[in-house]
Amino acid sequence: MMEWWNSLSPTVQVWLGGVLKASLILVWGLINFYLCLMLERKLSAWMQNRVGPWRVGLWGWIQPVADLIKLWVKEYIRPNNVDKWLYLIAPFIGFVSANLVWLIVPFGDKLIATDFEIGIIFIAAVMGYDVIATFMAGWGSNNKYSMLGAMRGAAQLISYEVTMVMAVIGVVMMAGSLRLSDIVLAQQQRGFLGWFLFPQIIGFIVYLIASLAELNRAPFDLAEAEQELVAGHHTEYSGFRWAMFMLAEYIHLAAWSAIAATLFLGGWSGPTLGQVAAGLGNVLNGFGAFTNPVGTAVLNWGLAISGSTILNWVAGVFWLVLKTYFFVFLAMWIRWTLPRVRIDQLMDLGWKFLLPVSMFNIFLTGTLRYLAVAFDGVPISIGSFTLRLLGWWL
């Protein structure tokens, strides 16, 4: 296989590699859509004391497939007075922008589709496509409810995009890089204590709230508030084109959760199978107090496989997916718990509270980074800095 690949010209290798990466990203996006949709339906049923889907497949786990087939075969109805091209293209722009985020998500050491040096800037650029898709859908539908939803959505997305980017700047300052893989490596120095969640707790909270608004998730789903706007910019869509918006929404949810896990929870960092086996072997051997044949065998096996790239990649994917779906669960929990806010409350929260708080976080991070030079140049949090300052003064 490698001989055949090496026999190809560099141009063909680039093209085939691009097609393979795009195909894998598309499949991964659809897998996340399936998992998120099923998890949403099960969690909502659990929180509302219902059973949820359980008839189609084992415990209802094929229900999302049945839903997609139903929407695929539904009659396509396009109103006569729509702007044809804007109306048709909008769902696909939203779907493509959702999948583009996965291009720069690192799943392991060198396990990444495209390791951009300006990964954070790429994320900010991709966010702009959501605004375009939302406004195109509202304008192209030529419907008052769609237009109102699109205007709300555009204002909301633009406002919270600024806040989200400002919240991430603190992480960039601590890592010293815009590359997501470098941000993960910067969090590996002290295990989970090195996660940026702790020194960047302010930025994390701001990012979490802003991402819910960016994803148009409750309690910030004002662009499609059913009680006010029928379905917002989705009003005139039906069948599979409506399903494209739903695909984009859930793929976006998983993608932004993966970004949060990468920025604040160490990304793919975590114990590998070899490290777990070696640790278990040390426990069975009493940490050197005595020798146990089983413990020695487990220890040697763990040390032997600790250098396996494939197993380390599997462990990286496992930890990233686990952390990602922690955020997915959190977003769904919030959706089915909190009531929807008003549009004026949403805008006030973004511009008058979250944006100033994120700017304060940048100032605080810069100050602590500057003062940390006096304490061996170690990135520090507010609490650890206070303790070190007291120790230095005393």
Curated annotation (Swiss-Prot):
One of its GO terms (cellular component) is plasma membrane. Its EC number is 7.1.1.-. It is found in: Cell membrane. One of its GO terms (molecular function) is NADH dehydrogenase activity. NDH-1 shuttles electrons from NADH, via FMN and iron-sulfur (Fe-S) centers, to quinones in the respiratory chain. The immediate electron acceptor for the enzyme in this species is believed to be ubiquinone. Couples the redox reaction to proton translocation (for every two electrons transferred, four hydrogen ions are translocated across the cytoplasmic membrane), and thus conserves the redox energy in a proton gradient. This subunit may bind ubiquinone. Belongs to the complex I subunit 1 family. NDH-1 is composed of 14 different subunits. Subunits NuoA, H, J, K, L, M, N constitute the membrane sector of the complex. This is NADH-quinone oxidoreductase subunit H 2. It comes from Symbiobacterium thermophilum (strain DSM 24528 / JCM 14929 / IAM 14863 / T). The gene is nuoH2.
